[in-house]
């Protein structure tokens, strides 16, 4: 029974895939692609700026020291 129901669905899906995209969806507006590329470049630049700021700040060192100190405190408490 399942096979009898799944075969027509499979044929329908295959026909839809082989038909291809609708004409309105087939062509992409070049202006849209240009805007999308500009957006990607802008986001990439902003991400690089944030990463550079994080690298130049002392937050990673402070975080590492805090974790080390906390880990040492936990080790000492568990030792007792």
UniProtKB/Swiss-Prot annotation:
Gene Ontology cellular component terms for the protein in this record: endoplasmic reticulum; high-density lipoprotein particle; very-low-density lipoprotein particle
Localization: Secreted
Keyword annotations from UniProtKB, A to Z: Lipid transport, Secreted, Signal, Transport, VLDL
Leader sequence residues: 1-26
InterPro entries membership: ApoC-1_sf, ApoC-I
Family annotation (Pfam families): ApoC-I
GO molecular function: fatty acid binding; phospholipase inhibitor activity
Keyword hit for Signal: yes
Note: Apolipoprotein C-I is present in acidic (APOC1A) and basic (APOC1B) forms in P.paniscus, P.abelii and P.troglodytes and perhaps also in baboons and macaques. The two genes for ApoC-I arose through a duplication process that occurred after the divergence of New World monkeys from the human lineage. In human, the acidic form has become a pseudogene sometime between the divergence of bonobos and chimpanzees from the human lineage and the appearance of the Denisovans. Pseudogenization resulted when the codon for the penultimate amino acid in the signal sequence was changed to a stop codon.
Function as written in the Swiss-Prot or TrEMBL entry: Inhibitor of lipoprotein binding to the low density lipoprotein (LDL) receptor, LDL receptor-related protein, and very low density lipoprotein (VLDL) receptor. Associates with high density lipoproteins (HDL) and the triacylglycerol-rich lipoproteins in the plasma and makes up about 10% of the protein of the VLDL and 2% of that of HDL. Appears to interfere directly with fatty acid uptake and is also the major plasma inhibitor of cholesteryl ester transfer protein (CETP). Binds free fatty acids and reduces their intracellular esterification.
Family: Belongs to the apolipoprotein C1 family.
Biological processes per GO annotation: cholesterol efflux; cholesterol metabolic process; chylomicron remnant clearance; lipoprotein metabolic process; negative regulation of cholesterol transport; negative regulation of fatty acid biosynthetic process; negative regulation of phosphatidylcholine catabolic process; negative regulation of receptor-mediated endocytosis
Name of the protein this chain belongs to: Apolipoprotein C-I
Disulphide bonds in the chain: none
Keyword Ribosomal protein in annotation: no
PANTHER family: APOLIPOPROTEIN C-I
């Amino acid at each position: 029974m399942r096979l009898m129901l799944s075969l027509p669905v499979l044929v329908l899906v295959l026909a839809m895939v082989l038909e291809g995209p609708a004409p309105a969806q087939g062509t992409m507006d070049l202006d849209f692609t240009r805007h999308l590329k500009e957006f990607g470049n802008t986001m990439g630049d902003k991400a690089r700026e944030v990463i550079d700021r994080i690298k130049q700040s002392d937050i990673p060192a402070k975080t590492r020291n805090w974790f080390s100190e906390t880990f040492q405190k936990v080790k000492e408490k568990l030792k007792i």
